Every structure is written in C-alpha cells, then in structure tokens.
C-alpha cells in the first residue's frame, strides 16, 4: 500500500480538533462516556502518528518530509503548509504520547467534563500543528490557539489562586506573541516578494542589523514559553495552580514549543544573527541552571519546587542550542524529549500525592512512604531520572550537551571552562534538592494530624500504568540513545553546518582549509 501521498499531518492535526467539536452532542450524564471517547480519539491519533512516521518517514533524509501545501490566500503566498523533519518529528510523537496519557490522568475530573475534554482534544491538534506548520502566519495562529485552552484549564480547574495564575499566563504569552506577529510580518514583506513560507523566508538576504532585530523579537517571545529567566515567573504560578493533566501538558509539551521555535526560527532562518546572540544564550542557559536550581532548593511548595526544577533543566537546551556542535544540538533536542517525559511523570505524581494528602507544603508531609509504597517507588524512580542518573534519558541528554559545548571551537577555552564548571555545579545541586524533597515527603516521622484526617491509600492501577508508560521510554533512551537520536541526527547535523558557517572565525578557518587543500600537491601521482 502506497501511503506517501496520503495527507498524514493534516489528518493528524484535524482529527482531534474535529472530534472535540462532537463532544457537545454526545449523550452523557456523568462524564464517563466523554472520557472514554476522548481517550479513544487520543489513541487513534497517536496510532496514526506512529504509523505515518514508520511507513513514510526516512531518518536519513534531513529535509522536510510528509509535506503538504494547499493554497489559502495566493495573493500573499499564504498556504496550509505542513511538513516534518528531524526537529519536529520527535516532538510530534511526544505530543501524541503525553496528551493521550494526560487524558487518562484526567479520569477523576468531574467538574464540567465536556468542556475539559473538549479543551484537551483541541490542544492536541493545536500542539501538533505548532511542530508541523511551515507557514509563519499559520504558525502564529496555531501558537495563539494554545493560549485559550491553557487559560481555561487553569482558570476553571485550578487551585485557589487560579484566576491570578491564568491571567498572568495569558498576559505573558499573549504579550510575547505580539513579537512573533511583528517579526513575521516584517520578514514576509521584506524584499521584492511577499511570502510567509518558512523555506522562502530562510532564503531572503537580510541585512545583519535587520537580522539582529528580528532575532531579538523572536527570542523574547520564545524565551517566555521556554522559559528563560527573567521571563519565567508565570510558570511557577501556573504549575502551582494546575491540575495533573494540565501539569503534564505544560511540562511535557508547552515548554518544548519555545525550544523548538528557537531552533526552527532563530537558528534556521536567521543563522548570522544567531552567531552574535549565541554567547548571550549560553550565559542565560547557565543562569537558568544555577538560579532555578537554587530557587527550587528553597521552595517549600512541592509544585513550585518541581516547576523551578523544570526551568533549570531547560537551561541545558539553551546551551546545547548555542554550542555550534552536532553533539550539543543533538543533546538539546534529546533534552527536550527527555524532560517532556520526566516532567510529565513528576507532575503527575505530585498531583497523585496531593489528591491523597490535600497539601503541597513539605512541612506538612513526612513519613507517608510506609502508607503509599507504590507512589514512593514511582516518585523515587522519576526523581532519579530528573537528577540524571546513568541509565536514564536525562543523563544521556545532559552529557551530550556537556561534551558538545566543551568541544566547541566557537568559544574561547576560558569561557568554556567557566561555563562547564557552572553547569557541573547545577548538576550537583539537582540531587540535593530532589533527594531532600523525597526525604521530607516519604521519610521521617508521620504527621499525625495529616494521617488522622486523610485516607492515604496507595496508587491505583491507572496511576501505575501512566508512570510505567513514561518510564519505559525514559529508561529505553537512557540505555540506547540511538533509539531517538537516529530520528533527528541528519537534520541537526545539517543545521549545525549552516550555523558554523555563520560564525566569522569558523567560516574563515573553513575557507583556509579549502584554500590549502586546493593548492596542495597531489601525493602519489
């Protein structure tokens, strides 16, 4: 069966969105039918994702594949244009995987289940579209599509300060989106032709100062979503009020949109400007790692502690992105996928713990490990993954970024030594705050007031299944990284070569080598 010409990506994007529109008319009284319907749609869409890439995607091809383009507004060269390469393909698979598990994690939701699952499925299609669309205006539209579902998930199903957290989220992200729109319009109308096609935009000859201005605009927008300090303050508040399924989507997918867009837009379209901004990004990455780790250590609220841990781990993505090495960029992509899995697992377990203890304050916990041994074991395993224990995906990703940056010839030796040392400090801080978190929750003397007022039952099969599904790829990638890296290495190698050509010193060295090679005598003739 020839599937090469089938509109896979369009089907994968539109299926959950179309399915969400049917939810209001499905007969259901207590929400049980709706949740099974949403889970079935999620599983079908994820199966389509896996099948499409298994049958129609070539790992050795660095260019866009599964390409579809349908005219939308021909006068402005606006098209429904989608495609996938090594950067987007792992994140599309991650989106399908995490969203399907988040649907299962939402099983206890009883408040407005129709609206909840409608938003979940709408987000499903929108998030895949972010990683697949190849038209800048379309990218802006699907980027904005994510704001409304996340806002409502926070504002309706969040905690006591949900309105504050939701409003802060929408102000930050909508404000950042303005920079995407302005930069996209400016690029589209630059030069003799008007186009929003990303590949065409990358071929335009922008003046360097113009590139720097565009790069700064995109950086502000994507730094909010990643997030990069100091544009991070919305995330701890959002995580502090979100429910477990919303946590999984925030940590597992939403943050990756920022990292993906930085690589796709800033590096892919504006490589010359990237050469000037890269040292700044490295410094910002180090600040993310150290500052967020120290702040996480000081947090007494469990959700905020894990939220700052997420910010710290995303610092490795920034440094790998700015390393100008194949290994560093490969590590950055691997870290995005790894953190998506680990972050989703930790926040799911935080939600499971809160459902039983009804508190997020570490001072009010203690000694619950004896009463909840399964949750204790799963929390420990996922924490080990987060602190980059060898044999788990986090270790491989961070090691690749370490070695990739340390071997980069785009920076001075002194700068590299300082950065690697500070990265190592951040890695050392991670087990300190995570192990102390485990000790405060599960070890020590039981809080008698907590035990007497709450029924501390252990994990149910549904919860064990969700964590098992997340741990399998975490451990699988940890022992055999090629399982994932082979999917995108061809694309990252091609992009790194282009980025290295944009660095004046590296480009000059390349020209010198080429000149010497051409002028050297041929030995053996």
Swiss-Prot record:
Query: Where does it reside?
Result: Cellular thylakoid membrane
Might you give the EC number(s) for this enzyme?
7.1.1.-
InterPro entries tied to this protein: NADH_Q_OxRdtase_chain4 (IPR022997), NADH_Q_OxRdtase_chainM/4 (IPR010227), NADH_UbQ_OxRdtase (IPR003918), ND/Mrp_TM (IPR001750)
Single biological process term from Gene Ontology: electron transport coupled proton transport
What is catalysed by this protein? a plastoquinone + NADH + (n+1) H(+)(in) = a plastoquinol + NAD(+) + n H(+)(out); a plastoquinone + NADPH + (n+1) H(+)(in) = a plastoquinol + NADP(+) + n H(+)(out)
Identify its membrane topology class: Multi-pass membrane protein
Main subcellular localisation: membrane
Its keywords, alphabetically, are: Membrane, NAD, NADP, Plastoquinone, Quinone, Thylakoid, Translocase, Transmembrane, Transmembrane helix
The highest taxon in the source lineage is Bacteria
Give TM regions. 6-26, 36-56, 91-111, 115-135, 137-157, 169-189, 212-232, 243-263, 277-297, 314-334, 335-355, 375-397, 417-437, 464-484
Q: Name one Pfam family in it.
A: Proton_antipo_M
Q: Name one GO molecular function term.
A: ubiquinone binding
Gene Ontology cellular-component terms for this entry are: plasma membrane-derived thylakoid membrane
Q: Which NCBIfam families match?
A: NDH_I_M, PRK02546.1, PRK12561.1
Which family does the record assign? Belongs to the complex I subunit 4 family.
What biological function has been recorded for the protein in this entry? NDH-1 shuttles electrons from NAD(P)H, via FMN and iron-sulfur (Fe-S) centers, to quinones in the respiratory chain. The immediate electron acceptor for the enzyme in this species is believed to be plastoquinone. Couples the redox reaction to proton translocation (for every two electrons transferred, four hydrogen ions are translocated across the cytoplasmic membrane), and thus conserves the redox energy in a proton gradient.
UniProt protein name: NAD(P)H-quinone oxidoreductase chain 4-2
What organism is listed for this UniProt entry?
Nostoc sp. (strain PCC 7120 / SAG 25.82 / UTEX 2576)
């Amino acid at each position: 069966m020839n599937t090469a010409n089938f509109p896979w990506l369009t089907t994968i994007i539109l299926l959950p969105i179309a399915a969400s529109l049917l939810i209001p008319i499905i007969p259901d009284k207590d929400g049980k039918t709706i949740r099974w319907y949403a889970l079935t749609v999620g599983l079908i869409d994820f199966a389509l994702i896996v099948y499409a890439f298994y049958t129609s995607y070539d790992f050795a091809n660095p260019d866009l594949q599964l390409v579809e383009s349908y005219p939308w507004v021909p006068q402005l060269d606006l098209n429904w244009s989608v495609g996938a390469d090594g950067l987007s393909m792992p994140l599309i698979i991650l989106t399908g995987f995490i969203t399907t598990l988040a649907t299962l994690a939402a099983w206890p939701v009883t408040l407005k289940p129709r609206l909840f699952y409608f938003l979940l499925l709408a987000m499903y299609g929108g998030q895949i579209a972010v990683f697949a669309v190849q038209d800048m205006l379309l990218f802006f539209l699907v980027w904005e599509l994510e704001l409304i579902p996340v806002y409502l998930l926070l504002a309706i199903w969040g905690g006591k300060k949900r309105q504050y957290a939701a409003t802060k989220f929408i102000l930050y992200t909508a404000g950042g989106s303005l920079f995407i729109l302005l930069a996209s319009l400016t690029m589209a109308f630059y030069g003799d032709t008007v186009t929003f096609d990303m590949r065409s935009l990358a071929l335009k000859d922008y003046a360097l100062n113009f590139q720097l201005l565009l790069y700064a605009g995109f950086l502000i927008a994507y730094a909010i979503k990643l997030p990069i300090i100091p544009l991070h303050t919305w995330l701890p508040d959002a995580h502090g009020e979100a429910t477990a399924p919303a946590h999984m989507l925030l940590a597992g997918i939403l943050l990756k949109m920022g990292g993906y867009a930085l690589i796709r837009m800033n590096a892919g379209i504006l490589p010359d400007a990237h050469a000037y901004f890269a040292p700044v990004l490295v410094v910002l990455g180090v600040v993310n790692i150290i500052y967020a780790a120290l702040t996480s250590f000081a947090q007494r609220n469990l959700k905020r502690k894990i939220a700052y841990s997420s910010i710290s781990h995303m610092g490795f993505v920034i440094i790998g992105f700015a390393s100008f090495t194949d290994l560093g960029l490969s590590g950055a992509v691997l870290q995005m996928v790894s953190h998506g899995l680990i972050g989703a697992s930790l926040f799911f377990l935080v939600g499971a713990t809160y459902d039983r203890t009804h508190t997020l304050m570490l001072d009010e916990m203690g000694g619950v490990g004896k009463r909840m041994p399964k949750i204790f074991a799963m929390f420990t395993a996922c924490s080990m993954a987060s602190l980059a224990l060898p044999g788990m995906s986090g270790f491989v990703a961070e090691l690749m970024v370490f070695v990739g940056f340390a071997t980069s010839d785009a920076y001075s030796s002194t700068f590299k030594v300082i950065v690697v040392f500070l990265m190592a400090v951040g890695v050392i801080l991670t087990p300190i705050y995570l192990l102390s978190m485990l000790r405060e929750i599960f070890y020590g003397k039981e809080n008698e007031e907590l035990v007497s007022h709450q029924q501390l039952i252990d994990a149910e099969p549904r919860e064990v299944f969700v964590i098992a599904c997340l741990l399998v790829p975490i451990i699988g990638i940890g022992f055999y990284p090629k399982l994932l890296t082979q999917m995108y290495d061809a694309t990252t190698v091609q992009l790194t070569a282009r980025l290295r050509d944009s660095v004046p010193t590296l480009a000059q060295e390349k020209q010198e080598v080429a000149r010497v090679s051409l002028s050297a005598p041929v030995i053996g003739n």
